[in-house]
Regions:
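Beta-lactam-recognizing serine transpeptidase/beta-lactamase-like catalytic domain environment
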Residues: 1-19, 24-176
Length: 176
């Protein structure tokens, strides 16, 4: 952005997380036993409750959790959002640090935001609808994250649930 050339977008830019958020939705659904990894859900190209579709409108047929995550299937994760509910999504997003600063030792870090009925009521004075839960389940709606928050969330998954606070080192004393 030529009007803000010195903004550190890694810590201060806030963007919809999109499909990586499906990891949080899936974690919530599995942990709350709203789905098993083996359960098959049929994707006809749109959800059966609300006309919410896959990005390209494609129908992917029968999918279990692993295949849905690998294909980044919106319809499957709309259903996980439906089963978990917005309260569950908000809770699990908080476990992964969504809507909170990472604590990096840099000035200007943004906290992002997790979509919720309370946020919508506060900002827009409007009711929450199921379609917004579906959007939140796939990382859209009012959810905003910094690139660093997404990196921390994904590293937590890669590290088996161990979350490390990021920091900028001033020096490295030795290679060990």
């Amino acid at each position: 952005d030529k009007n803000h050339p010195f903004d550190n977008k890694v810590i201060s830019g806030e963007y919809p997380p999109g499909s990586p958020f499906k990891i949080i939705t899936g974690t919530a659904a599995l942990d709350l036993k709203k789905v098993t990894p083996e359960e098959m859900i049929f994707d006809s190209g749109k959800h059966w409750l609300i006309d919410k579709r896959n990005a390209e409108g494609e129908a992917l047929g029968w999918l279990n959790f692993n295949k849905a995550l690998a294909k980044s299937d919106n319809v499957y994760f709309y259903e996980m959002g439906n089963r978990v509910g917005i309260e569950g999504l908000v809770k699990y997003a908080g476990y992964f640090g969504i809507g909170e600063k990472t604590g990096i030792n840099l000035v200007g870090e943004a906290s992002g935001n997790m979509a919720s009925p309370a946020y919508k009521r506060k900002v827009y004075d409007e009711d929450w609808y199921l379609g917004e839960t579906f959007d939140a389940a796939i990382g859209q709606s009012f959810t905003l994250v910094t690139p660093l928050q997404m990196a921390v969330m994904l590293s937590e998954v890669a590290n088996g649930g161990i979350k490390y606070r990021p920091y900028v080192a001033s020096r490295i004393d030795n290679k060990d």
